UniProtKB/Swiss-Prot annotation:
Intracellular or extracellular location(s): Cytoplasm
Organism: Bordetella parapertussis (strain 12822 / ATCC BAA-587 / NCTC 13253)
A GO cellular component entry from the record: excinuclease repair complex
Taxonomic placement: Bacteria, Pseudomonadati, Pseudomonadota, Betaproteobacteria, Burkholderiales
PROSITE patterns documented for this protein: GIY_YIG, UVR, UVRC
Organism superkingdom: Bacteria
GO biological process per UniProt: nucleotide-excision repair; SOS response
Gene: uvrC
Domain UVR: start-end pairs: 203-238
Cytoplasm keyword on record: yes
Listed name of the protein: UvrABC system protein C
Length: 609
């Protein structure tokens, strides 16, 4: 520790109050963030002789100072801790990927509700069901609701402008409320039954449909009875195919932890309304040497900090901090979940299955990790880079690519490879402006100057390898930029396409004068380079297309004779965007105010020509 940091005096002055502490190294970088019910006791515990975790012992040896923040409560400390972990990503905290928000199934608040896949803040009017572990689980549930209850999935703009039933009605997946095939009351009943099904009342819904079918048959309403019979048949198939269990109606998350080969997997399974919706594996970083219970606690703290916790958590290990779930509930303004570590009955089988899935996901990850690390090693050996384990893990590769269509909407992409894998959160796109359309050299000069100008100013990290998608010309442009910025040109490598642009025939071109190298199509190093190069190309293409579409969307309609700003606005408002206008029939187009039959034909031909 530095001489100006008096540890003994610092610890003596700490209060017996809740708060957050941060361990900093000699460079002032935050290495670890934690919360405490009692700051004095918790921070002092790090400086005892015997620490259970080798990782934490290694961190403590590097501590140069400690910052503390006193909070009004332990719940407030938990919130601050999670915010700091997310923003700082300290290298000694167990970290879970801050994933996209989970998807939900939404039944809208429209007079004729639609069912929809939804991801984002749950602020729209309607009923939300979930969260689901993945998009596939939501879409499967939507298909079930279409089969059984025949609820609509079309956008409101399409619903409001249909003149005849769509294909979904013809195949029995929609009751066509858009054109009045079903009465409002009957459709509302179908929606209510769908809600009850999603809430775990599938058996009760089945009994109700059967009773209504028998009544309709008795009253000689055979057509209605046939519809109800088909509903019952579809629901019966679902009940046989799905695992539907009656466990008190409480939604449940099942969390299992598996460890092997120095890696840990946390597997989260979700049960909603008695239906097992599937599971999702998580692989934390900085968890080497940690006990499964500690990793489980970190997962619970980070995963439920921003999201709703279900009434029941079934866990493979007991949480070291028994008060954590209560703090999360207090923070979110909800009731604390029941935590079960020795479940019985069906919950026990859920946990056993989650544990098996965690172990299988971990085995797959270890196999893939070994293969990825092997490719990184092969590349390092081919390019004469450091090959020790730490250097390979820290090897950062950035690849740049330029994309445009005949000079329009030129965009550069930068993708990043780090820790033996692509890192999408570090990808960047650059809009290229002020150059002659189609001048790829000028575009490359601009993006490299913008990106590595920050490196020269000490504001961004310098990668160990910079890949340029191109041959001698592009590499020479990159070399000039690096020389102007005072950067080492040895890290610059161009990937020149082979004869016929065939994969495996690429040649590596070096900026420092080394002779070109052809690694061969069987080379693991070339496989890695091709993966990074192709990802840069994909990322650039998607960005360019989005930018081009954005600039074209407005102009495509206004280019049609007879369409001005006012008519364009009416069309976009009626059909919800250009794609809706493109999907509309001539009759639908002609129903818009100010659009004649002749103009509707002209619009249709222009968008479909």
């Amino acid at each position: 520790m530095p001489d100006d940091f008096n540890l003994k005096s610092f610890l003596a002055d700490l209060p017996h109050l809740p708060g957050v502490y941060r361990h900093l190294d000699a460079a002032g970088e935050v290495m670890y963030v934690g919360k405490a019910r009692d700051l004095k006791k918790r921070v002092s515990s790090y400086f005892q002789k015997n620490l259970a975790s080798p990782r934490i012992a290694q961190m403590v040896a590097k501590v140069a100072s400690v910052d503390v923040t006193v909070t009004r409560s332990e719940a407030e400390a938990l919130l601050l801790e999670n915010n700091l972990i997310k923003s700082l990503r300290p290298r000694y905290n167990i970290l879970f990927r801050d994933d996209k928000s989970y998807p939900y199934l939404l039944i809208t608040g429209h007079a004729w509700p639609r069912i929809a896949y939804y991801r984002g803040a749950t602020s729209k009017r309607g009923q939300y069901f979930g969260p689901y572990p993945n998009s596939w689980a939501v879409r499967e549930t939507i298909q079930i609701l279409q089969k059984v209850f025949r609820l609509r999935t079309c956008e409101d703009t399409v619903f409001a402008n249909r003149s005849r039933p769509c294909l979904l009605h013809q195949i029995g997946r929609c009751s066509a409320p858009c054109v009045g095939v079903i009465e409002a009351g009957d459709y509302a009943h179908d929606v209510q039954r769908a809600v009850r099904f999603l809430n775990g009342e599938a058996r009760e819904v089945m009994d109700e449909i059967e009773a209504r079918m028998l009544q309709a048959s008795t009253e000689l309403r055979f057509e209605e009875a046939a519809v109800l019979r088909d509903q019952m048949g579809s629901l019966s198939k679902v009940l046989h195919q799905q695992t539907m269990e009656n466990v008190g109606g409480d939604d449940t998350d099942v969390i299992a932890v598996a460890s092997a080969g120095g890696k840990i997997c946390v597997n989260l399974a979700m049960v909603r309304g008695g239906r097992h919706l599937g599971d999702k594996p998580f692989f934390p970083t900085h968890a080497e040497g940690e006990q499964p219970a500690q990793v489980l606690e970190a997962f619970v703290a980070q995963h439920y900090a921003d999201g709703a916790m279900p009434p029941v958590l079934v866990c493979s290990h007991a949480l070291p901090d028994s008060g954590l779930v209560g703090l999360l509930a207090e923070q979110g303004g909800t009731r604390a979940a029941r935590v079960l570590t020795r479940p019985q009955g069906v919950r026990r089988s859920w946990l056993e299955q989650a544990q098996k899935n965690a172990e299988m996901a971990l085995a797959r990850a270890l196999t893939e990790s070994g293969a990825r690390a092997g490719r990184t090693l092969a590349l390092a050996e081919a390019l004469d880079l450091d090959t020790d384990e730490e250097s390979l893990d820290a090897l950062r590769i950035e690849c740049f690519d330029i994309s445009h269509t005949a000079g329009e909407a030129t965009q550069a992409s930068c993708v990043v490879f780090l820790h033996h894998d692509m890192q999408p959160s570090l990808y960047r796109r650059y809009n290229i402006v002020g150059i002659t359309p189609g001048d790829d050299y000028a575009a490359m000069r601009q993006v490299l100057t913008r990106r590595f100008g920050k490196v020269a100013d000490g504001e961004a990290p310098m990668p160990g390898l910079v890949l340029i998608d191109g041959g001698k010309g592009q590499v020479e442009v990159a070399r000039q930029v690096f020389v102007e910025l005072g950067l080492d040109i040895q890290s610059l490598v161009g990937v020149a396409k082979g004869e016929g642009r065939k994969v495996g025939l690429e040649t590596l071109v070096f900026a420092d004068g080394r002779p070109p190298v052809a690694l061969g199509k069987e080379s693991a190093a070339l496989m890695l380079i091709a993966q990074v190069r192709d990802e840069a190309h994909r990322f650039a293409i998607t960005g360019m297309r989005a930018r081009r579409a954005k600039t074209r969307n407005v102009s495509r309609l206004e280019e049609i004779e007879g369409i001005g700003a006012r008519r364009r606005q009416r069309l976009l408002a009626r059909f919800g965007g250009l794609s809706g206008v493109s999907s509309a029939s001539i009759e639908d187009l002609a129903s818009v105010e100010g659009i004649s039959q002749e103009l509707a034909v002209r619009i249709y031909d222009a968008l479909h020509g």
